[in-house]
């Protein structure tokens, strides 16, 4: 892949608020269609053999619920119930995992009061536990520091500790 081995795509966020500035990057508002698009994009990047010169490691982002930010505002809070999380938000991410995506990127938002980058339920319990994801999780640009702004961490050291404990493997 011309010396480029890793891409921070595809974005597989489901969004139902056209005001959100990143809505055009995702797979739409339907989790079934979004899942099919997620699979196609992962397979398009990674193909069947990552040692082939025309392949690149894909990253499913933004884990999770970034597309459900309140009022369509980027970086805003996300307050959703388990039904929406499990039946609408997560299916395209699970589809990406099942298609063999090698990395996940966590999100800037919080999910019900817990920043995505330090969210144990999302990263450790669901992604690495229930789904048995063996790749690694990278933060979005400086998203681990969002734990400070959300009031969960007092400084960058505590934010990094909380993120690693929750399942984040690499800080971008």
Give a label for each model feature.
Residues 1-172:
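Glycoside hydrolase catalytic-domain context in secreted enzymes
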């Amino acid at each position: 892949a011309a010396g480029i081995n890793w891409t921070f795509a595809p974005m597989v966020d489901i969004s139902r608020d056209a005001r959100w500035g990143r809505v055009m990057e995702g797979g739409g508002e339907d989790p079934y269609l979004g899942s099919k698009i997620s699979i196609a994009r992962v397979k398009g990047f990674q193909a069947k053999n990552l040692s082939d010169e025309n392949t690149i490691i894909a990253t499913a982002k933004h884990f999770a619920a970034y597309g459900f930010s309140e009022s369509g505002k980027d970086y805003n809070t996300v307050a959703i119930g388990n039904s929406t999380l499990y039946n609408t938000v997560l299916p395209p991410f699970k589809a990406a995992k099942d298609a063999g995506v090698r990395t996940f990127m966590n999100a800037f938002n919080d999910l019900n009061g817990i920043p995505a980058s330090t969210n144990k339920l999302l990263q450790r319990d669901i992604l690495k536990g229930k789904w048995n994801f063996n790749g690694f999780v990278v933060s979005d640009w400086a998203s681990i520091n969002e734990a400070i702004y959300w009031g969960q961490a007092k400084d960058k050291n505590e934010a990094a500790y909380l993120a690693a404990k929750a399942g984040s493997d690499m800080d971008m």
